[in-house]
């Protein structure tokens, strides 16, 4: 846009080179544009005024640089003199050409206001010459919890001093470089992408938990340094230990522990790059002016008198600096007070507390791997932890990887310690550091419209309803976005991987079609009449008049911060489920997400409700209704095949449809008690796959026998394992309250699976609607390996009605008197002769 303005002003065409940094030519461009607009007497100013912003922290001036899009960064001793400021090719437009009076007008009267606090922080002598300390800078960026389909970094000993980063969007690669005279451990990322820390970020906290309960739960592992509970009502707390081993032990022992019927989700918290004074001490001391003849063993003997030392590190290009990390931050403070300004090896040393995370990846260990393993194990035994006797992570010993120009690691799923440098949210001194172009281009770039997202299993919402706002999973906290370039607001799911990019589609799951996007829409038009009428089904579907109220209390996620998102569009009841957006398609009937069959949606048409303009789902086209005879009270169902655009985004469909607008399916007990909630069909999630239908029925009937009239457990025909969830229809909405209290957050007793059950409303509501869905040949015809097991408990209904309902589609056996049916597909390769054998085989 700037170049266009300048072109208009000067009356000639100007083009920026496609790979040239805009900031490089900005001084000359602005100078010429202002001169053109003001007749040659205008002001000439630089575009680097962002340096003078005191409202934004200069977090990255110590490790990042703005560079051309095709260049790479590297900091080492070959760096040119930083006192010389060179900005791209703009040397020809020197500041000498700027009129002095123009500069006087631009500058404030009081020179102290020019750079408030900036000169004091500008210490070029302390600039690092490697990117080993590059990591997340926000307390909420915990990393971890992800299951990435990429090669583990633990198998590579990578010299982080050779790391080089690019500003090409979110593509990241780092190149091992030979590091002379070092042999030993090279620390890599902690498992699950986390870096060990003394501070634990505990999510999914019940707001009613007392501080004393948290202290009693975490104190057995070590003395607590601080307990931050101000955000407990938003679902998380932060617990900081003095000893890093205590944090490791607490995380290992308490991960997935139940507290007030909530499963704790614990991660390491990365300290901020600009911590407060009380948080500055992270247990690491920096020794300046230490003689090179002083060995690490001598330092270990001297500093070890004040506490247990975790490791001693030295940087390859700064031989006069050493890093000493203590397990306990109090020991580091004691050593700092005792040994600062003391003499070692004939030189007066200076001690300072290292900034959090500074230079902790490159290390020359003072102890062997076995010794560290023994110390950590002994500490776990002392605090009584039942965790495994292994240190937190893989810490290989050996020489670093030799430098190779063609060896690179590409992390398309996000790398927590590398971020793009040329982005809008990185102001400050990063722009004045000189660029070092490199000939290395061995990486696979992704779209430059993507930001680096930790745990970024990102969902793309419909543009008409949510305006590109992505939701996270229930029990999740909106995470920090690093290096984000996209303009859309994003809430990131915690246990996920991959990138998400916004794209425009006509429909998304959860968005109504255009004819429903106006406030006057109150119902579904009938195919036989132009009269609009609401749903009138038993156990009912939400009435159209209740559409607004259905969204009222579902705008936030349980155990997390409110999303503060307001719905401006009314929605129909069939708008897609966060977990089962297609009824059965996402629960395992079609496990091949690259198959277009998984896109097919099925809308159930009820008497008086059929419509040719019903919402067909994500990119689906509607078809004429297919009538079926023999079903009582059901006239037709509507199978919806996939449209052509559904094939294009097969890979995105699972992630995009899984977490969309989960608030609408949240069970609100207050609404049930007040009578505002009339839905009765639930989905039970996280069922162990080895649970059989009889096991599930027995567990439900233990306390809720007679409270439900429909139970369906989808099962894989080949391996006899269920698909991890079931559908249940309660007789009355009031029965949901005790059922929710029993099963939501329940740990399944059998098989020691560790899965925690959760409940939500299903997309298809009502026993009749579920039965009609199963009656549809298209819903099961292509998936012969699956069959549902359905239980009925209607004592007043005749058995012949049930047989009539399913006889045209399913082979039915009635093993008991409570009308518990085991249903098999007719296309099943199993023989259908003996009903009793079929029932035993399917169960």
UniProtKB/Swiss-Prot annotation:
One of its GO terms (biological process) is positive regulation of meiotic nuclear division. The keyword RNA-binding applies. Residues 198-271, 283-356 form the RRM domain. Disruption phenotype: Early flowering. Keywords: Meiosis, Repeat, RNA-binding. Disulfide bonds: none annotated. One of its GO terms (molecular function) is RNA binding. Pfam families: RRM_1, RRM_2. The lineage of its organism: Eukaryota, Viridiplantae, Streptophyta, Embryophyta, Tracheophyta. The gene is ML2. This is Protein MEI2-like 2. Probable RNA-binding protein that plays a role in meiosis and vegetative growth. InterPro entries: MEI2-like_RRM1, MEI2-like_RRM3, Mei2-like_Rrm_C, Nucleotide-bd_a/b_plait_sf, RBD_domain_sf, RRM_dom.
């Amino acid at each position: 846009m700037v170049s266009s303005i300048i072109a208009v002003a000067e009356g000639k065409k100007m083009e920026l080179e496609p790979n040239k940094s805009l900031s490089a030519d900005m001084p000359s461009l602005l100078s010429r544009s202002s001169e053109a607009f003001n007749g040659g007497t205008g002001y000439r100013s630089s575009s680097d005024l962002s340096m003078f912003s005191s409202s934004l922290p200069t977090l990255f001036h110590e490790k990042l640089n703005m560079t051309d899009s095709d260049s790479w960064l590297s900091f080492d001793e070959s760096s040119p003199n930083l006192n010389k400021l060179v900005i791209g090719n703009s040397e020809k437009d020197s500041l000498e050409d700027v009129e002095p009076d123009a500069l006087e007008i631009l500058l404030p009267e009081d020179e102290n206001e020019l750079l408030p606090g900036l000169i004091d922080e500008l210490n070029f002598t302390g600039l690092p010459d490697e990117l080993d300390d590059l990591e997340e800078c926000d307390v909420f960026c915990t990393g971890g919890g992800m299951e990435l389909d990429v090669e583990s970094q633990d198998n590579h000993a990578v010299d982080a001093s050779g790391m080089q980063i690019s500003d090409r969007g979110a593509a990241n690669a780092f190149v091992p470089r030979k590091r002379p005279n070092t042999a030993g451990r090279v620390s890599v990322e902690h498992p699950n992408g986390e870096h060990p820390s003394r501070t634990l970020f505990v999510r999914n906290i019940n707001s009613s938990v007392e501080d004393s309960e948290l202290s009693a739960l975490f104190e057995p592992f070590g003395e607590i340094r601080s307990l931050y509970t101000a955000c407990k009502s938003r679902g998380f707390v932060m617990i900081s230990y003095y000893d890093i081993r205590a944090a490791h032990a607490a995380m290992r022992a308490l991960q997935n522990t139940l507290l007030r019927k909530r499963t704790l989700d614990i991660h390491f918290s990365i300290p901020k790059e600009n911590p407060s004074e009380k948080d500055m001490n992270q247990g690491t001391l920096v020794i300046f002016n230490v003689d090179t003849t002083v060995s690490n063993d001598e330092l270990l003997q001297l500093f070890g008198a004040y506490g247990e030392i975790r490791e001693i590190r030295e940087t390859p290009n700064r031989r006069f600096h050493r890093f000493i990390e203590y397990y306990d931050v109090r020991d580091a403070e004691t050593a700092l007070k005792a040994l600062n300004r003391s003499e070692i090896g004939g030189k007066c040393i200076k001690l300072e507390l290292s900034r959090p995370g500074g230079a902790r990846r490159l290390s020359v260990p003072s102890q062997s791997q076995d010794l560290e393993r023994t110390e950590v194990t002994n500490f776990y035994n002392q605090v009584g932890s039942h965790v495994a006797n292994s240190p937190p992570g893989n810490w290989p010993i050996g020489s670093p990887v030799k430098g190779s120009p063609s060896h690179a690691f590409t992390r398309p799923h996000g790398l927590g310690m590398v971020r793009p440098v040329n982005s809008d949210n990185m102001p400050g001194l990063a722009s004045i550091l000189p660029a070092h172009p490199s000939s290395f281009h061995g990486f696979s770039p992704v779209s430059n419209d993507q930001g680096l997202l930790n745990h970024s299993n990102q969902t793309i919402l419909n543009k008409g309803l949510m305006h590109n706002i992505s939701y996270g999973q229930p029990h999740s906290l909106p995470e920090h976005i690093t290096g984000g370039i996209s303009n859309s607001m994003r809430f990131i799911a915690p246990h996920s991987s991959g990138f998400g990019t916004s794209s425009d589609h006509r429909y998304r799951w959860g968005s109504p079609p255009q004819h429903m996007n106006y406030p006057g829409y109150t119902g579904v038009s009938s195919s036989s009449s132009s009269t609009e009428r609401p749903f009138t089904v038993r156990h009912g579907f939400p009435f159209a008049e209740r559409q607004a109220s259905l969204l009222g209390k579902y705008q936030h996620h349980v155990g997390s911060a409110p999303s503060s998102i307001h719905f401006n569009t009314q929605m129909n009841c069939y708008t897609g489920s966060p977990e089962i957006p297609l009824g059965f398609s996402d629960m395992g009937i079609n496990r091949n997400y690259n198959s277009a069959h998984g896109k097919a949606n099925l809308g159930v048409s009820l008497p008086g409700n059929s419509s040719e303009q019903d919402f067909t789902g994500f990119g689906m086209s509607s078809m004429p209704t297919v009538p079926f005879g023999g079903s009582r009270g059901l006239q037709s169902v509507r199978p919806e095949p996939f449209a052509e655009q559904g094939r294009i985004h097969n890979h995105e469909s699972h992630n995009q449809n899984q977490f969309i607008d989960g608030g609408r399916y949240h069970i609100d007990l207050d609404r049930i008690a007040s009578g505002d909630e009339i839905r009765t069909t639930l989905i039970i999630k996280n069922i162990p796959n080895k649970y059989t239908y009889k096991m599930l029925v027995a567990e439900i009937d233990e306390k809720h026998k007679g409270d439900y009239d429909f139970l369906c457990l989808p099962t894989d025909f080949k391996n006899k394992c269920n698909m991890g969830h079931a559908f249940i229809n309660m007789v009355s909405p009031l029965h949901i309250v005790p059922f929710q209290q029993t099963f939501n957050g329940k740990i399944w007793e059998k098989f020691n699976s560790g899965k925690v059950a959760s409940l939500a409303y299903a997309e298809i509501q009502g026993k009749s609607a579920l039965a009609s869905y199963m009656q549809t040949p298209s819903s099961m015809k292509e998936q012969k390996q699956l069959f549902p097991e359905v239980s009925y408990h209607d004592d007043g209904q005749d058995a012949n009605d049930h047989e009539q309902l399913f006889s045209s589609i399913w082979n039915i056996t009635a093993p008991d008197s409570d009308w518990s049916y085991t249903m098999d597909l007719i296309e099943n390769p199993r023989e259908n002769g003996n009903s009793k054998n079929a029932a035993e085989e399917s169960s």
